[in-house]
């Protein structure tokens, strides 16, 4: 929609454009306007509140051209979804078009908390789907929603069952496990102590590394996680 495109161009910061381009190097720099996240978020909130019908029309017009249009779309899902099922429909339409980690990870859907059981079932669908960032989104949502009171040990095996080569999927898996080691050590540490190791070597070692980088664990835990690292093994 031309009005939205022009609005985003008016909000752009040329200095920020170069910085943002470095964060998502797989995106053509000419398709990044340089709108800062807080500015885009404020615009999305105003747009969703004052023009919800136009916002939903915009969300139906896929694919978008600019990186910021995709980010706006992601923000609008969280703002406009009335139920988990409403969000699922929006996400199933949008996620196949997501082409970078930043757009994927900015999507926050508060209504998921209304029905975690149904959301978990949907996450299980996403992580076995084909689109790269649909899988990543599923892992990120499992990390966001299911590592506290809703955690179940079987979730560790769920993420382990993902057998993909894409870097940004496996980074999300490592991110998930690093938080599991921090938040659910009684279950996650024995998971990492298994022989043979339950993950591919890269994800296993990256998970331990990211956990060691946290300030939330003790020096003793960091040393132990270092001792678990696989020095050399075939993936």
How would you name each of these model-derived features?
Residues 1-235:
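Alpha-helical scaffold domains
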């Amino acid at each position: 929609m031309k009005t939205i495109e022009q609005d985003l161009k008016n909000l752009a910061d040329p200095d920020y454009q170069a910085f943002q381009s470095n964060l998502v190097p797989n995106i053509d720099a000419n398709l990044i306007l340089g709108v800062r996240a807080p500015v885009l978020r404020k615009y999305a909130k105003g747009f969703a509140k004052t023009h919800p019908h136009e916002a939903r029309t915009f969300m139906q017009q896929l694919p978008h051209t600019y990186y910021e249009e995709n980010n706006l779309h992601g923000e609008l899902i969280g703002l406009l979804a009335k139920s988990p099922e409403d969000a699922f429909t929006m996400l199933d339409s949008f996620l196949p078009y997501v082409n970078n980690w930043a757009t994927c990870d900015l999507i926050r859907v508060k209504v998921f908390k209304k029905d975690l059981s149904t959301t978990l079932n949907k996450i299980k669908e996403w992580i076995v789907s084909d689109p790269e960032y649909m899988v990543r989104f599923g892992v990120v949502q499992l990390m966001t929603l299911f590592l506290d009171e809703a955690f179940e040990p079987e979730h560790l095996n769920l993420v382990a069952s993902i057998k993909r080569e894409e870097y940004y999927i496996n980074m999300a898996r490592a991110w998930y496990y690093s938080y599991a080691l921090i938040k659910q050590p009684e279950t996650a540490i024995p998971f990492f102590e298994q022989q043979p190791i339950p993950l591919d070597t890269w994800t296993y070692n990256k998970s331990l590394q990211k956990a060691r980088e946290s300030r939330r664990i003790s020096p003793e835990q960091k040393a132990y996680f270092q001792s678990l690292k696989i020095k050399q093994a075939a993936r």
